[in-house]
């Protein structure tokens, strides 16, 4: 079986169930976040000067938590639309998710809100929080210090 890997210009690296993100501004430049989509884990690694990596933090997420975490992180530093989160949550193409949200707004928003509500305790370990952008979506950001 051949392993496939791809890079994109936003600092993402994807390889069979692994998603690596640099998240400039959310994590230090010498760290990388690796999402294991199968195990539903997020692991923060520190790149040691000798070329090795040291694990800084790891958290395990619920299935729905991981389904909304991925688009939130991909949207960073911008917010992620409710429609994108709902599409990821229910595994629908964006157009279908948008149509369902038009037809059943309260129900779809509630399911997104419930999935996002599972994130804060896990994200705190990384020093992050999720903020609601009223009527639009959610934003992942660093917890303000001070």
Question: In which residue ranges do the predicted regions lie?
Answer:
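Context-gated lysine
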Residues: 2-3, 78
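Short amphipathic alpha-helical recognition elements used for nucleic-acid or partner binding
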Residues: 53-97, 119
């Amino acid at each position: 079986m051949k392993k496939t890997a791809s890079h994109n210009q936003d600092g993402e690296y994807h390889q069979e169930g692994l998603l690596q993100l640099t998240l400039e501004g959310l994590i230090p430049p010498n760290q990388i976040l690796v999402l294991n989509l199968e195990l539903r884990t997020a692991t923060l690694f520190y790149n040691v000067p000798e070329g090795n990596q040291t694990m800084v933090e790891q958290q395990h997420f619920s299935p729905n938590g991981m389904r909304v975490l991925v688009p939130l992180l991909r949207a960073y530093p911008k917010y992620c639309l409710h429609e994108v989160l709902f599409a990821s949550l229910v595994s629908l193409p964006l157009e279908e998710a948008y149509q369902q949200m038009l037809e059943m707004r309260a129900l779809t928003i509630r399911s997104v809100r419930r999935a996002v509500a599972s994130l804060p305790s896990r994200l705190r370990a990384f020093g992050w929080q999720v903020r609601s952008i009223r009527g639009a979506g959610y934003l992942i950001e660093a917890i303000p210090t001070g």
